[in-house]
Amino acid sequence: MTTEHPGTLAQPIPVEEIQKLLPHRYPFSLVDRILEYIPGEKAVGLKNITFNEPHFQGHIPNHPIMPGVLMVEAMAQVGGFILTQMPGMEDSFFAFAGIDKVRFRRPVVPGDQLIMTVEVITVKAKRIAKMKGCGTVDGQVAVEGEMLFSRLNFE
C-alpha cells in the first residue's frame, strides 16, 4: 500500500488474485480489479462492462443494459473480498441474506466502468455481516444499497 491515501494500493489487485478468495467464475465473476482496500473496513472494485457478456443477448435487445441484480451481485463480490480476509473468516463463503434500500440511479451499458465502493457496517459473531455499497460510472451513482451476508458452512 502507498501512504498517499489510506487504502490506495501500489498496484490494483487483479482478477487472478480475487479468484483465489472468491468462488465465482465466468460468467458470474463480476469484479475485474480491486483498486483500494482497507482490511476489515472497505474495498473499491472495478468491473469493465463489455458487450460480450452473456446477459446482454437478452437484456435488452438493441439497447443493452446491465441487469440491476448483477450490479448488486458485483457489489456483493467486493464485500466478499473484504469478508474472506478478516481474521477467523478465511476460507469462508458468505451468501446473500438480504438487500435493503437498493436504488438504481442510471443505466450501466457496454463500455462503462462500474466502480464499486463497499464499506462494512457491522459483523456479528463472524457469521452475519452488513455492508453498504455504491456503484458509480463516470462519477455518477448507478446503484446503491445495503447488503446482508450470512456465512455458510459446506461440510
From Swiss-Prot:
The keyword Signal does not apply. CDD domains: FabZ. Keywords: Cytoplasm, Lipid A biosynthesis, Lipid biosynthesis, Lipid metabolism, Lyase. Its main location: cytoplasm. It is an enzyme of class 4 (lyase). Transmembrane segments: none annotated. It comes from the Bacteria. Disulfide bonds: none annotated. The active site is at residue 59. Its EC number is 4.2.1.59. One of its GO terms (biological process) is lipid A biosynthetic process. Gene3D superfamilies: Hotdog Thioesterase. It catalyses: a (3R)-hydroxyacyl-[ACP] = a (2E)-enoyl-[ACP] + H2O. SUPFAM superfamilies: Thioesterase/thiol ester dehydrase-isomerase. The keyword Lyase applies. It is found in: Cytoplasm. GO terms for molecular function: (3R)-hydroxyacyl-[acyl-carrier-protein] dehydratase activity. One of its GO terms (cellular component) is membrane. NCBIfam families: fabZ, PRK00006.1. Belongs to the thioester dehydratase family. FabZ subfamily. Involved in unsaturated fatty acids biosynthesis. Catalyzes the dehydration of short chain beta-hydroxyacyl-ACPs and long chain saturated and unsaturated beta-hydroxyacyl-ACPs. This is 3-hydroxyacyl-[acyl-carrier-protein] dehydratase FabZ. The gene is fabZ.
